[in-house]
C-alpha cells in the first residue's frame, strides 16, 4: 500500500469565502480558509480561541484547535460559478467582494499549508481554481516549504505570499512557535521562492518588545539577504482579563525570551478595549526603527498595527497585495483613508453591501460605507 493511501484522510466540507468584521480598518476584509484548525501551536495565536469557541457552539465535541478539517475545492468551484453567473446582491457582501475582485486572503485563521497538505492538496486545488480566473490571492503561512514543493505550478500566478515569522532565533521560536518549522528553514524557503519570482512578504506579527527591538537590524538584514520583497509588523496584544491557561502561556513565552512579558506590559503598556497593548510612544519608536531598516536594506515596509499613520509604511495594503493584477480594495477603511495617494482602486460597490454578517445585529440594516463612516467619526 502506498504511503498516500495508508494515511488517514482529513474530513472535508465546504465553507464559502466571507467578509470579516474588520472592514472599518482593513482595506481587504475578504478571507477564505482552506483548512480549519492548526497544528503549529503558536503560544500567541489569536485564532485558537475563536476556533475552539465556534466548535463548542456547534456541538462538535469541543474539538481543539489542533483538530484539522479540510475545505472542499469542488464546493468552491460551484460557489464561484454561481457567484459569477449572479447579479450584484448587496445582502451578500462575499458575493460582491468576489465580483469586485477584492483579493481573497487564504490563511487568515488557519494555516493553508499543514503537513497533510502534502498529500491532501486541498490548498493546491483551490489555488488552481483561483488561478484559472487570474483571481488575486494573498496567502499567509508559517510553512512555505509545503508551497515550495509545488510552487513551480504557480509561477506567474496572481499570488501574494506572506510568510509569518516573529523571531530570527531558532531556539526561541522552537519554544513559542512550537509546531512550526524553524525560522532558518523559513528563510531558506523564502530564498528559493524568490528565485522563482514570487514576491514574499514576511509578517512580523506580532513584534514583542523589547526582544524585537534588540534583534531588528539582524532580522531585517536576514530578510533582505534571503530575497524577501517586504515585511509587515504589528505589536503583541494580551487580554486584560486572562484565564489560568493564558497566564501559563505568558509564563512560557517569558521563559523563552528571558524576561517577564506580562510585567513589561504592566509597566510600559496601556489598556485599549479589553487588551493590553504597547504605548503609542513605544509603538512609534519601533515603527520608526522598522522604517529606517527597510530603507537601509532595500525592502518595502508595511505597518499592520492599529496605530495607523502614513509616516509608517509604504501604503494601505499591509499584507503585500499592491502588485496583484486587476484588483480593488475597500477605500472607506481607516487604513486606506490614511494612504489616499497609494494608487489603489476602491470598490464603491462593496461599500453598498449590508453589514448582516457580524454578531452586532444593530448594524444589520446599515451598509459597509455607513458603518465605516460611523467608525471614523467615533475614533476622532
Which sequence ranges carry the predicted segments?
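Conserved Radical SAM active-site core
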Residues: 3-162, 170-171, 380
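Conserved non-cysteine loop/helix-boundary elements of the Radical SAM core domain that shape
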Residues: 64-68, 113-121, 171-191, 208-218
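Conserved radical SAM core fold
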Residues: 103-114, 144-148, 161-180, 207-209, ...
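Hydrophobic faces of well-ordered beta-strands that scaffold small-molecule active sites
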Residues: 104-106, 137-139, 161-163, 200-204, ...
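Conserved strand-turn element in the central/C-terminal portion of the radical SAM core barrel
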Residues: 179, 192-213, 272-280
Amino acid at each position: 500500500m502506498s504511503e498516500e493511501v495508508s494515511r488517514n484522510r482529513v474530513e472535508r466540507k465546504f465553507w464559502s469565502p466571507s467578509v470579516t468584521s474588520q472592514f472599518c480598518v482593513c482595506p481587504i476584509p475578504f478571507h477564505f480558509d482552506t483548512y480549519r484548525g492548526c497544528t503549529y501551536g503558536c503560544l500567541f495565536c489569536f485564532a485558537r480561541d475563536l476556533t475552539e469557541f465556534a466548535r463548542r457552539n456547534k456541538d462538535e465535541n469541543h474539538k481543539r484547535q489542533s483538530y484539522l478539517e479540510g475545505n472542499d475545492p469542488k464546493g468552491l468551484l460551484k460557489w464561484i460559478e454561481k457567484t459569477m453567473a449572479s447579479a450584484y446582491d448587496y445582502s451578500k457582501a462575499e458575493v460582491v467582494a468576489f465580483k469586485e475582485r477584492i483579493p481573497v486572503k487564504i490563511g487568515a485563521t488557519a494555516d493553508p499549508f499543514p503537513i497533510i497538505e502534502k498529500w491532501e492538496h486541498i490548498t493546491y486545488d483551490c489555488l488552481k481554481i483561483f488561478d484559472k480566473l487570474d483571481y488575486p490571492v494573498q496567502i499567509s503561512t508559517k510553512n512555505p516549504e509545503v508551497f515550495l514543493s509545488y510552487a513551480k505550478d504557480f509561477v506567474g500566478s496572481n499570488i501574494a505570499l506572506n510568510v509569518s515569522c516573529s523571531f530570527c532565533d531558532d531556539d526561541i521560536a522552537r519554544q513559542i512557535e512550537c509546531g512550526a518549522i524553524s525560522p532558518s528553514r523559513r528563510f531558506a524557503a523564502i530564498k528559493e521562492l524568490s528565485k522563482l519570482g514570487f514576491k514574499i512578504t514576511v509578517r512580523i506579527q506580532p513584534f514583542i518588545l523589547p526582544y524585537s527591538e534588540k534583534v531588528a537590524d539582524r532580522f531585517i538584514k536576514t530578510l533582505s539577504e534571503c530575497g524577501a520583497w517586504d515585511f509587515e509588523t504589528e505589536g503583541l496584544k494580551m487580554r486584560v482579563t486572562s484565564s489560568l491557561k493564558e497566564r501559563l502561556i505568558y509564563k512560557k513565552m517569558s521563559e523563552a525570551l528571558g524576561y517577564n512579558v506580562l510585567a513589561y506590559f504592566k509597566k510600559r503598556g496601556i489598556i485599549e478595549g479589553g487588551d493590553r497593548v504597547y504605548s503609542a510612544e513605544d509603538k512609534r519608536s519601533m515603527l520608526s526603527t522598522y522604517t529606517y531598516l527597510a530603507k537601509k536594506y532595500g525592502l518595502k515596509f508595511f505597518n499592520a498595527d492599529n496605530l495607523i499613520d502614513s509616516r509608517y509604511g509604504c501604503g494601505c495594503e499591509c499584507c503585500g497585495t499592491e502588485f496583484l493584477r486587476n484588483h480593488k480594495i475597500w477605500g472607506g477603511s481607516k487604513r486606506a483613508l490614511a494612504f489616499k495617494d497609494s494608487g489603489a482602486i476602491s470598490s464603491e460597490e462593496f461599500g453598498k453591501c449590508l453589514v448582516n454578517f457580524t454578531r452586532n445585529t444593530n448594524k444589520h440594516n446599515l451598509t459597509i460605507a455607513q458603518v465605516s463612516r460611523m467608525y471614523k467619526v467615533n475614533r476622532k
